[in-house]
């Protein structure tokens, strides 16, 4: 089976947002599956968001932020750059 290749490059801001979410998860000592459960998301989708492989809706950002105990604005203020 051939590996699928992305038609469009990953958006750097989306990747950065995912890194921030991952950093908050680690800083709070949480597990990805716990955050996914609390946000009522499939764990695989959350992993795609964290890796920047899938864009998310604003409603999904709200759920993730709530499950992390931060605001959506905090996700962008805490956004890490490479």
Language model: regions and residue ranges:
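DNA major-groove recognition helix of helix-turn-helix/homeodomain DNA-binding modules
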Residues: 59-74
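DNA major-groove recognition helix of helix-turn-helix
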Residues: 50, 68, 76-79
